[in-house]
Amino acid sequence: RIQPLDQSTVNMSDFVISSAQSEEERSRKLHEIIDSIQNEVYRKLVKGMLIHAGRKFIEYPAASQIHHNYLGGLSEHSISMVEVCQMLCKHYPQLDYDLLVSGALMHDIGKTAEMSGAIATEYTLEGKLEGHISIANGWLTEVAAKEHLEDCEETIFLHHMILSHHGKMEFGSPVLPKLQEAEVLYLVDNLDARLNMLSQALSSIKPGTWTPKLFALENRQFYKPKGKE
């Protein structure tokens, strides 16, 4: 007999494509990242925006297609970017760690309102008409006002990180990166997205063969060397 299931008792990652990292691992990493932010303003802003998103930040994909388009993809992408930024901050000590990490963690948080759900997601009316950059920027304004931080320089900087992270106006950013951390954020975002697209494409073909043309990678094909699994 067919009976409805209590969704709270079901692990959806058992049934759909999902992040290779468990939800518990991503949640643990998220808390560690927040604890690593020493600047009190950035930490309050990040925590406030995560409250806006709730569990959606952990559960949602980063896109309906293209990259990290699976259960948990948004948090996987954001955490991966933070980890790259942490390495870059060690190599380039002139970078503001707290700003760069906060920007990496929050840059796509508006996607939790831009998309309709964690599985078989579509773009919401708000998502289509406003986009995740505008949505996240609005949330940041609300959180900053609630915390009485709207006049802090850090708040202005985090606004800029969110607004400029697509790197170019023709890619959807209303402003170009004008802080060194914003330039790094744009480059790391692009790197992480492209490598995820390549990983997915290469994992689906046999060694010694080519991927189909990848639209998001300038319609190029990529070769999987023999001996690679």
Which positions does each model-derived feature cover?
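Alpha-helix initiation and N-capping motif
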Residues: 23, 27, 42-43, 155, ...
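Compositionally biased, low-complexity linear motifs
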Residues: 199-217
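Divalent metal-dependent catalytic cores for phosphoryl transfer on phosphate-bearing substrates
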Residues: 66, 76, 87-205
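Flexible glycine-/small-residue-enriched beta->alpha junction loops
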Residues: 5-7
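Extended acidic/polar, glycine-enriched regions
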Residues: 1-3
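N-terminal intrinsically disordered, cationic/polar leader segments
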Residues: 186, 210-215, 226-229
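Acidic/His-rich, divalent-metal-binding segments that scaffold phosphate/diphosphate chemistry
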Residues: 9-129, 152
